[in-house]
Structure formats: C-alpha cells, structure tokens
Amino acid sequence: MRFFRLPGVYVPQEDTALLLEAFSRERVDHGAAVLDVGTGCGVLAVAAARRRARAVAVDASRRAVLTTRLNALRAGVRVRAVRGDLLTPVSGGRFDLILANPPYVPVRGGRRPLRGSGRNWAAGADGRALLDRLCRGVPELLRPGGVVLMVHSSVCGPERTVKALEKGGLTAEVAARRTVAYGPVMRGQTPWMREQGLIGAGDVRDELVVVRGEHLT
C-alpha cells in the first residue's frame, strides 16, 4: 500500500522501516492493544490493525492525525488516531505493545519548535527530550508481558534508553541495528554535533537502533 501524506507530516524513512521489521517479529494476539506514539503517516498503526490488533495512534500534529485516519480508511482497517503530547492522550490506558518513533535529532540551542517540520525531528541538545519522557511513562502503560519497541539514533545513547527502561522495571536490550547514510536533517546538524563531540570528525553514517523493553510477568 502506498501511504498518503499531507504536507508537513513526517515522511516514513529508514527508522520507520527498522521499527516495522522489529514489530513484525513480535507476537500480536487478536484484539491486542497496540499504541503507536509519533505515528506520522500511520504506517505502524495500520500494520498493527492489519494484524487484528486494537490500534491507537498518537501524534502532536493535527495533519498527522488526519493523515493516519485517511490511511487507515484506505487500508480498510480501524485505527483510533488522537492528537496530543506523547503519552498524555492515553494516560491511564494499558497496552500489550507500544511502538515509538519520536523525534531524536540533537539541535543547537536545545529548543523544540512548537510548529513546522522541525517538530518532526528536533529533540533537544542531546536528542533525548522526548526519549527520556517516553522511558519514564511507558512502564506504567504496559500490561504484564507487554513490550515496547523504540527506535532512535545511536547518537542519543542506546545504553541510556536501556538503563532508563530498566529503572522503570522493564528488561531491556538493543533488539535491532541498521547503519544508514545521514539524511538531510542529520547532515544539517553535523557541524554542530561534531563541535559537541556527539559524532566523530569523519562520521557520515548513522546507526539506527530499536530498543526493546518487556514488562515480565
């Protein structure tokens, strides 16, 4: 299926594909509750619904929410797409699987834009402005036996994500890796990231990772 995308909505890229592959390896029972955080075009949410899950998609962008609803309609599946800040719209909910592809690119000044395409990728001075919030909030939303899959750049420190999830009571590990060439966004931040020591002088490729956390019964 070719996904429709309104202007300004995050374009599915290598991180989307890596997370989708990791998701395909997870067991999804009929009627399982699956949450897609930072849904963008709704690729992961639609994939979950196709596996007969009860899919909920969250994004801060109105256009992303509308895009996801339209793509679910085109795919002939049901997805509940809601607008809001990370996990806030699903506070108090419980899920069997949580998928997250949050903004993770470090930016000079550390501020996240309130609007515009930069909101799709800018994530503070160390790229963890949203990752750390997710790590703190995810454990209480997972049912016993539930799993979280979170994709981000190795620049953000996969070990920090693992430790943060473990602090929340989950078992955690890096479940998938993929090395890709820097895209336009990362290339734009390269000089500053080199100044900050976030990447090496000769680095021109990025390692994407999927961190898997599980709420053991």
Residue map of PLM features:
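Conserved SAM-binding strand-loop segment of SAM-dependent methyltransferases
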Residues: 76-86
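Conserved SAM-binding motif I beta-strand of class I
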Residues: 54-59
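Mobile active-site "lid"/loop adjacent to the S-adenosyl-L-methionine
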Residues: 102-130
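Conserved acidic residues
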Residues: 32, 96, 146
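Conserved Class I SAM-dependent methyltransferase catalytic core
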Residues: 128-186
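Nucleotide and nucleotide-moiety/phosphate-recognizing core
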Residues: 53, 69, 73-74
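SAM-dependent Rossmann-like transferase core, predominantly class I methyltransferases
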Residues: 1-51, 64-67, 88-89, 191-217
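A short acidic, Gly/Pro-enriched loop at the edge of an enzyme's catalytic core
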Residues: 87-98
